[in-house]
Amino acid sequence: MSNGLPISIGRPCTHDSQRSLSASDSRIHSRFDSLLDTDLPMVHSEGTSAPTQLLRHPNIWFGNIPPPPRRPQDNRDFSPLHPLVFPGHHSQLRHVHETQQVQQTCPGELKLSGIEELPPAPQRQHSLPLHITRPSRFPHHFHARRPDVLPSLPDHGPVLAETKPRTSVRQPRSTTRGPSFRPILLPEVVHVHDDPPHSSLRPGRSRSRQLQPTIRRPLLAPNQFNSPRQPPPLSDDPGILGPCPLAPNSTRDPPPRPITPGPFNTHGVRPLSVLPRAPPRRGLLPNPRRHRTSTGHIPSTTASRPTGPPSRLQRPVHLHQSGPHTPDFRPSGIRKDAFLQTGPRLGHLERLGQSADLRTSERTPSTKRRLPRPSEPNCLPSSLPEATLAPSYRHRRSHPLLPNPPAALPPIAYTSGRGKIHHSLPKGALPKEGPPPPPRRLPSPATPPQSPLRDLGRTPSFPTPPKTSTRAPESCIAAPPTDIAPLDSDPVLSVRTEVHAPERRTFMDPEALRAALAGLPSPPLSVGIIRTASQTVLPTNSPSPTRHLPPTSSPWILQSPVGEDAIVDSEDDSISSFHSHDFNSPSGPLRSQSPSRFRLHLRSPSTSSGIEPWSPASYDYGSAPDTD
């Protein structure tokens, strides 16, 4: 049976609540046969199913499923080791499955219940009336694990439909408002028209359709200024053979067609002129759509060679009669190696009609991309503009103050390893003598006034302060009654001198400047030292912690002998000031105080206090910009 529990091991058994399951087939296993000798009720009194009891029997073993324990704790406790559905790979138990037991009744005992009709309620949206209760649970309906859940309801038969006129379905618009309903319109039925009776019976041929005329658009007035350009007629196409030849007795071209003027225009507008005929195009294939005309009446003439120079190089063609004994004969104008011909064709200079052993003097000089010979002298500029300096913009200057052009600088002595160019001082200007000013304190923020040049003719010096004199007063500088130079506002000792010298203009070629830079020695040799007689005691602690200088290695400094060189200041050229930039110090480069004076900064060669000597006239071309 499809709804019962079919067993394919022996003969099929019937479902009967009064009878028992019996099997007497000889093919059944002895263990299973001894089990089936006993009566197994199909319906359990407590509601459990027959397959469940069959599975719980300790003497039945289905293939690879282990038997359940002998003494289970409860009949309703089903072991999870046994699945509800048996494995399908077993050929004998592939039809065993759980299902509901169908209750069989005698045909005489079947009682048909009366058809329950719904009461005619005026409101159709109400639920079912409350007097229709759910039917009682039947004991024959069971679940896989719990027989009290999901009971099946009996079939009460079809419900009689009410025969009422067709009305629109109404649904409430809102639950809070009154019983106002909005009708829902059903879609109208669209009838498909059948083919007319005189339609074509052949399915492969399409029915003839009536062509509808397109919308007629109004014609625009023709514009005489923008008339379309008409192509030349096909009769004027010369074709591949060129234009038609002239008559044999004619020696000149036929006269062109006269241009016929248009009608007289009274509005002053230039009349339209007939477009000129397009020039004959040579080298074009004839139009295949054009009808060929007979040209038997035209005598054959040879085209004359043009008198002008040819537009491209033409090689003479050598024609030789072919013979049976000359299969490998080639004309002399063609080389045997095809790769050697690619040079002249691609424009190689050595293969354009010139032999390889041709001397250089005999070759045709090339006019384009000619490089100057090394024997030719370099063109030097005849004159350069006078020495000028870039304007000084404080707080906006992004480059050091350098003369423009660089030729206005004094002669170059040497180049230091840090990228500074040191210039030698010009001769002929000696410093002037002046009274020694009183000493000044270092932390004084006021700028000292400009003073004349002090005496520097005795080769003074800056001796290294002794180790025992480092405890001197920090705010004073001791000096003998000799010449004393005033101190700048900078805590580092510096001597500022002002020198006036006659006008001296120096111009130098940039090429010569580069050659001089390359040939200069790196260390200074046989150079004098500028010294002063003042003995100074530098403070141990700097007045400002931000102005402290770390001990660094002293660079090469230009030191010129006194009495031979001096600093030149030109009044006519309005030179602003030369800076000696030292970007290793935290304070940055020194700033100019006088726009029209040279400033000479000197430092003591002492390295015990961490002070780095400066160059008297050094210009750093690669220094960082001044952004203060």
UniProtKB/Swiss-Prot annotation:
Ranges of biased composition (kind: Polar residues):
166-178, 295-305, 586-596
Give the top-rank taxon of the lineage listed in the UniProt record for this protein: Viruses
- InterPro entries documented for this protein: 45/70kDa_tymovirus (IPR004935)
Q: Where is the composition biased (Pro residues)?
A: 433-451
| GO biological process per UniProt | symbiont-mediated suppression of host innate immune response
Entry keywords, A to Z: Host-virus interaction, Inhibition of host innate immune response by virus, Suppressor of RNA silencing, Viral immunoevasion
Q: Where is this region: Disordered?
A: 1-24, 141-492, 537-628
Function comment: Acts as a suppressor of RNA-mediated gene silencing, also known as post-transcriptional gene silencing (PTGS), a mechanism of plant viral defense that limits the accumulation of viral RNAs.
Family recorded in the similarity comment: Belongs to the tymoviridae protein p69 family.
Protein known as: 69 kDa protein
Organism (species): Turnip yellow mosaic virus (isolate Australia)
Lineage here is: Viruses, Riboviria, Orthornavirae, Kitrinoviricota, Alsuviricetes
